[in-house]
Curated annotation (Swiss-Prot):
<feature type="binding site">
    <location>
        <position position="173"/>
    </location>
    <ligand>
        <name>ATP</name>
    </ligand>
</feature>
<dbReference type="Pfam" id="PF02110">
    <property type="entry name" value="HK"/>
</dbReference>
<keyword id="KW-0460">Magnesium</keyword>
<protein>
    <recommendedName>
        <fullName>Hydroxyethylthiazole kinase</fullName>
        <ecNumber>2.7.1.50</ecNumber>
    </recommendedName>
</protein>
<feature type="binding site">
    <location>
        <position position="51"/>
    </location>
    <ligand>
        <name>substrate</name>
    </ligand>
</feature>
<comment type="function">
    <text>Catalyzes the phosphorylation of the hydroxyl group of 4-methyl-5-beta-hydroxyethylthiazole (THZ).</text>
</comment>
<feature type="binding site">
    <location>
        <position position="200"/>
    </location>
    <ligand>
        <name>substrate</name>
    </ligand>
</feature>
<keyword id="KW-0547">Nucleotide-binding</keyword>
<keyword id="KW-0479">Metal-binding</keyword>
<dbReference type="InterPro" id="IPR000417">
    <property type="entry name" value="Hyethyz_kinase"/>
</dbReference>
<keyword id="KW-0067">ATP-binding</keyword>
<keyword id="KW-0784">Thiamine biosynthesis</keyword>
<dbReference type="GO" id="GO:0009228">
    <property type="term" value="P:thiamine biosynthetic process"/>
</dbReference>
<dbReference type="GO" id="GO:0009229">
    <property type="term" value="P:thiamine diphosphate biosynthetic process"/>
</dbReference>
<feature type="binding site">
    <location>
        <position position="127"/>
    </location>
    <ligand>
        <name>ATP</name>
    </ligand>
</feature>
<dbReference type="InterPro" id="IPR029056">
    <property type="entry name" value="Ribokinase-like"/>
</dbReference>
<keyword id="KW-0808">Transferase</keyword>
Amino acid sequence: MKKCDLDYTQSICDALNTLRQQKPLVVNITNYVVMNNTANALLAIGASPIMAHSQEEMAEMMSFAGSLVINIGTLDSVWIPRMIYAVEQANANNKPVILDPVGCGASALRTNTARQIVALAEQLTIRGNASEIIALAGEQAQSKGVDALDSSDKAIHAAHHLATQNNCSVVISGATDYIVTTTATIALNNGHEMMPYVTGMGCSHTALTGAFAAIGEPTGLAATAVLGIAGEIAARDAAGPGSLQVNLLDTLYHLDEAVLREYIRINLVEEGCH
């Protein structure tokens, strides 16, 4: 492992320790399908989740929360103004915004709403699958509803465009996960092939990204490593997706620095690292 890869590993370990000390509050405007999954993932890693969808309380919430997670999985016309207002309040309070553009490219409503949030958020991290990232950037994507048909490496160019145009970090989920910032592209090769068979796994990834952003790690690197490693370990004793989901929460809860260092497979794809 190169020195710069070791430096990234140390930063991931430090971020996990800090998160558990600070227990940040993460405001989630997320979809009906995954609220329970994402709340449990946040609790297991050491954060404090709240599912707040009311516009009337959002100014108060964002005044003391650590970050805002927006997930457009069950989007409708009622939710959109609430999401926009929440982003405005996050901006007003200098708080990071994490966007999960679920199904971006599958409909004009999803694509336009996601792009509106990207344009508005001042401290932004985007986490999506390859097809969502490609569509969000305005390129031609292949998707089936909310599922990606593009491999994660096919979205790197689109992620670079989004990161550069919006001064943000972009996380591409897939068999290999990529973290794309304005200065580096990092590949992580953890996780397990069973993980896509658990609904809300990507949404949990986004929520964890919000937890780490709340303590000053907005790139998505720590969240991606933590979830990938936890999923890999949880799958060892899982008979199928059902037991994987339960095992994952237990593994997140018990995850520590020694396990992170043992399992992490990280590679700096692009930057001045020799």
